[in-house]
């Protein structure tokens, strides 16, 4: 029964760091994490702190 307490604590900590609570670096750059190619009007700047299958998309600013 002791293993259930440890397992539930581990799962709680694992879900605490899921997306929505993560990606501060991408959001600080006015970006968002996207799993497919970035939408039009945005450009990819790499993975940053997104999940392994996502890239950080930021708006393209016209000059």
Swiss-Prot record:
Keywords, in A-Z order: Disulfide bond, Secreted, Signal
Location in or out of the cell: Secreted
Leader sequence segment: 1-22
Intrachain S-S bonds: 26-56, 33-50, 38-57
Tissue: Highly expressed in pancreas, heart, liver, brain and kidney. Expressed to a low extent in the venom gland.
Primary subcellular site in the record, as a coarse category: secreted
Superkingdom assignment: Eukaryota
GO cellular component: extracellular region
Protein name, as recorded: Crotasin
């Amino acid at each position: 029964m002791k293993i259930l307490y440890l397992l539930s604590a581990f799962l709680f900590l694992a879900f605490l760091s899921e997306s929505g609570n993560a990606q501060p670096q991408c959001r600080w750059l006015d970006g968002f994490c996207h799993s497919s190619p970035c939408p039009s009007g945005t450009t990819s700047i790499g993975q940053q702190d997104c999940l392994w299958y996502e890239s950080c998309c930021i708006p393209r600013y016209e000059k």
